[in-house]
Amino acid sequence: MIFQYDGTYEGFLCTVFEIYAMHLANDAQIHPADGCLTLEESRTVENQSGKADRVSQRLKQLGIASCIYDAWLSRKPDIENDLFAVIRLAIETGCSPMQARQRTCVRNVAAAAHLVRCETHRFLQFTRFVKVEREPEKPGLQVPGETKPGLYLADIEPAYDILLRIAPHFVRRFQDQCFIIRDQPRGQALVYDAHHWQIVSFPELMALPLPRDSQIESL
């Protein structure tokens, strides 16, 4: 059976939960619902935080939570099924299978996680912010104004979906500044208002041009 999920990591974890709840671990395939066309029997999994949390805790106990998450962020074609194969191995053996490099699924997951980690490290080092002269009024962006003036903007073009990975670093580093990091290839942005951060997808926000060189003030 093909299990379709909403394309989020929480949705993927819920799908793993559903597969085991239905005792279909030996016959299941996982695909994002977006773009998945099939004539085979399929089931769409609803995102439920309780189920995702239970699977997340189990992955931590097995010592594979970080690797699974990083590899999932690669968004490589069919990565979900390699991830599920690794999870199955971990559950069957009661420990991490990531040293079993003779298995294709383990090699694929390890390679994907490595690529995401390398790219994350690169953008943590080389992301460049510029100051926007006028703060844009966009939904989801609440700038405190007088107490935290200014808005800093950075555009990145990563090969992998790393906004969630780099968010904690930049929030800690610039905790008293308002900033936006735009992932241009994916049309989404990390928005921080000096209090809270979130990932948003507003076309108007993505279309905001960077300041001209004469207007740039680096952060």
In which residue ranges do the predicted regions lie?
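N-terminal ordered "arm"
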Residues: 1-51
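Extended, charged helical/alpha-beta scaffold domains that provide interaction surfaces
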Residues: 2, 29-34, 47-52, 59-219
